[in-house]
Amino acid sequence: MCPVDSITETPETEAVKAAVADPDKIVIVSTSPSVRIALGEEFGLTDGSFVEGKMVAMLKKLGVDYVLDTNFAADMTILEEAGELVNRIAHGTKPLPQFTSCCPAWVKFAETYYPDLLPHLSTAKSPIGMQGPTVKTYFAKKLGLDPRRIVNVALTPCTAKKFEIRREEMDAAGKYWDIPGMRDMDQVITTREAAAWAREAGIDFASLADAPFDPLMGEASGAGVIFGNTGGVMEAALRTAYHEVTGKTAPSSFYDLEPVRGMEGIREAQVSLGDLSLKVAVIYGTEQVRRFLAEKKDQLQEYAFIEVMTCPGGCIGGGGQPKGTQVKGEKLLVSRIRGLYRRDAQLAKRNSYENQELQMLYRDFYGAPLSEKAERLLHTHYTDRSSLLGCDAGSYQVPREHTGKIRTGYEEVTKPGNKTRKWKCRICGYIYEGEQPPAECPLCHKDSSYFDEIKRWRCRICKYECEGVEPPAECPVCHKDSSYFDEIKRWRCRICGYECEGVNPPAECPVCHKDSSYFDAE
């Protein structure tokens, strides 16, 4: 699945830098909404700072040729997805509920563990999935660019986008031009990667003057902006769906849709589109998805539209974002969420269908949402991957019970609970959970000797925590090297059996009051 809050990403910056240095290449960077609300954290700016202009200026200073706004494609995704939703409701073209499809980790999770849901997933590509082929077709035509020279780069908060752009079917532009091997999007770099590149180049981010996006695919509505928040895709789509159903602008309540906003893992609402009443849900986190689907198994048909994101808070909490959440927790995510909602509220155009550059795109190229050309370039299909499990996917659909956490004056420990460990195959990267590694990897079929235990690590300086076979080469928060990391172990009191986790055992057992010498590492 998505390496949510991953220790580090597989870097692609060197490939992008090489393209920038190549005079035969035209480097186009498209920036996701959540990047501009978190990038400033990497340079010491206030949490939730909206740094869109500085972000564009930074990329221009790094030498890229064009900087475009993926919010433009978010508006495009809304038009396609809302149109598909209305068709499902009005004409029964596909089953309800319709699930969102813009989160690549959720898509792969559904393909692997819930293949029966695939007909319910919107076929609309994610904003990055739509931006790629549109740049290499429409944008290239308008500006007279050779699409073979274009290096399409997505700047995202998400590490799973690196997988998404390499899905076999993400080659619509190549098929359009009949150029085998051409990919829609060529590289993905995360917020952290971009910040590291800027630091390496000696850029003083805070002093940069704001710069605008390049024209043609740089306009976006407030609906595109809030795509980065959990509940944002739902709110944006409902604004357009209301217009599609009634022919009128949505009422004011649709521009601050409280029932779908917030940090609760599962939120539900009843929404009226004129005379049409829809039951909707917003979910983030795969464990919450399991819980929702298990609890609503017999009532799922009552819902019309369900948004799913895997990261906490949505894309603003993506695995490629600055790691401040390790220290500041949910408070930082809320700052980012509020920053995007503030930006939405500031814009004159808050509906995707009001985007004039997007109107021009449909008039001059796609024709209309869900047109034959739009279906070819902007929509996709999904693959049943459940065979990778080597067993019935149903056995993975039972929600796990979480163990709670206690905070003591000494350090954080967990209540006694599941002793399951995580193991990683050195060959294919498959992750297995169990007390011991599996006898055989279900993907590459190597035996248990090829598995390493995934451990937990804590930085002694800033208390950042992460998981990995080895500690990270550098702490993403305080930038100390791996020697500053200690393994977090499970400890058990020999007298009373009390269990806890920490770098060291507690000074005193809270149950039998024996000192730390009575604790053994398990």
Task: Pin down the residues of each PLM region.
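Cysteine-centered iron-sulfur cluster-binding motifs in ferredoxin-type domains/subunits
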Residues: 1-5, 310, 426-440, 460-476, ...
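Iron-sulfur-associated redox domains of electron-transfer enzymes in respiratory
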Residues: 9-416
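Generic recognition of long tandem-repeat/solenoid scaffolds
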Residues: 267-274, 425, 459, 491-494
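Residues immediately within or flanking Cys/His clusters that coordinate Zn2+
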Residues: 96, 155, 305-308, 422, ...
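Iron-sulfur cluster-binding cysteine motifs and their immediate structural context
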Residues: 1-13, 438-449, 472, 476-483, ...
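Short domain-boundary/entry signatures in modular proteins, especially
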Residues: 8-12, 420, 451-458, 485-490
